[in-house]
């Protein structure tokens, strides 16, 4: 994913945590914040060290990033932070995708219906 689509600075994360809305399911917590300055979404991913070793954490992050790449055209211009919870470490890529799509629909980040 290009740099323009990433949230990297701690101050950005803190602002979204403070001012954004959160939605959760068992596997993920999603914070969203309407960013009026950008014409596209920005994504921040947080996977705690409690979830496992670096291989496990990176696998989860890759699956989350891939899901956003697939739906790139259908996502509203918002700042989005995805936090992985403990059950996500035991899921395969397809399960992560369906769970993430579920929580993103609840968070209303899609601009049209997703199957």
Curated annotation (Swiss-Prot):
Gene3D superfamilies: 3.30.230.10. One of its GO terms (cellular component) is ribonuclease P complex. Its EC number is 3.1.26.5. The keyword tRNA processing applies. Disulfide bonds: none annotated. Pfam families: Ribonuclease_P. InterPro entries: Ribosomal_Su5_D2-typ_SF (IPR020568), Ribsml_uS5_D2-typ_fold_subgr (IPR014721), RNase_P (IPR000100), RNase_P_CS (IPR020539). It catalyses: Endonucleolytic cleavage of RNA, removing 5'-extranucleotides from tRNA precursor. GO terms for molecular function: 3'-tRNA processing endoribonuclease activity; ribonuclease P activity; tRNA binding. GO terms for biological process: tRNA 5'-leader removal. Keywords: Endonuclease, Hydrolase, Nuclease, RNA-binding, tRNA processing. Belongs to the RnpA family. PANTHER family: RIBONUCLEASE P PROTEIN COMPONENT. Consists of a catalytic RNA component (M1 or rnpB) and a protein subunit. RNaseP catalyzes the removal of the 5'-leader sequence from pre-tRNA to produce the mature 5'-terminus. It can also cleave other RNA substrates such as 4.5S RNA. The protein component plays an auxiliary but essential role in vivo by binding to the 5'-leader sequence and broadening the substrate specificity of the ribozyme. NCBIfam families: rnpA. This is Ribonuclease P protein component. The lineage of its organism: Bacteria, Bacillati, Bacillota, Bacilli, Bacillales.
């Amino acid at each position: 994913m290009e740099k323009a689509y990433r949230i990297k600075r701690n101050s950005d994360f803190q602002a979204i945590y403070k001012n954004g809305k959160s939605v959760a399911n068992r596997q993920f917590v999603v914070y969203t914040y309407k960013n009026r300055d950008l014409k596209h979404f920005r994504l921040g991913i947080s996977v705690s060290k409690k979830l496992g070793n670096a291989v496990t954490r990176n696998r989860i992050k890759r699956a989350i990033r891939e899901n956003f790449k697939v739906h790139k055209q259908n996502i509203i211009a918002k700042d989005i932070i995805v936090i992985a919870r403990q059950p996500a470490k035991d899921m395969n890529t397809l399960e992560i995708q369906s769970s993430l799509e579920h929580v993103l629909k609840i968070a209303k980040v899609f601009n049209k219906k997703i199957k």
